[in-house]
Amino acid sequence: MKILVFGKSDIGDGISQLYSETVNVPKEECDVRDEVQIRETIKKYNPDVIVNCAGISHVQVVKDSSIENWKEELEVNLLGSYLIARESISTNMFRPMIFIASVAGMYGKPEHSGYSASKSGVISFVQSLGLEGYNAYSISPGRVDTKMREKDYPGEDRRTRLTTLQVAEIVKECIEQKYAPGDNIIIRKRGFRKLKRVDQGQPWKVYLNVQPLGTPKTI
């Protein structure tokens, strides 16, 4: 199996670590806003699975925000997901596609309006893909121990964060089809729980599969 990861991210490193001995996991740094680069990358690797980890965040209150930063967040986080999905479907409509969203896409966050809006769009977009019959999933982690998190929240206690390997484990479960297409899988460090949204009519209210992710010693 070959898993193509878009975005040179820490989560991508976690996926590589999880599959290091059994699966080819190329990571591609192409500009996800460029449909030509995406098309050429998918053609080059012809992957069995695509994971989009590419993302960007700007810390800014709305009053002092710039249009350029807002556009960049929407284009990288949301438009990039759309372009990757469209190109993936055009070559293999049955290929699993996994998009790293965020719990920030489920509610607003101060100083992260553009990021929250873009990730909310990713979650809804993946739901649409699932309803159209495509094998797409979104994963919405809480705090993850990444360089981007450290940039946005310097000095934050790293013990409150998920590891990238834990997020990779949920990617693996999506590949193994333990969830339904269109699902958004929410994982939080608090309580060591994994939550799966199952009620299409009332999102974020009904959950299944509440189970331990591990113990404090392993997290």
Predicted features, each with a name:
Residues 1-21:
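Canonical Rossmann dinucleotide-binding motif of NAD(H)/NADP(H)-dependent dehydrogenases/reductases
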Residues 53-59:
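Conserved NAD(P)H cofactor-binding loop of Rossmann-fold oxidoreductase domains
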Residues 61-62, 69-71:
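Substrate-binding pocket helix/loop in short-chain dehydrogenase/reductase
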Residues 65, 108-116, 128:
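Active-site loop-to-helix junction immediately N-terminal to the catalytic Tyr of the SDR YXXXK motif
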Residues 85, 118:
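Active-site helix of classical SDR
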Residues 102:
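Residue(s) in the substrate-gating loop at a strand-loop-helix junction
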Residues 138, 155-204, 208-213:
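C-terminal helical subdomain
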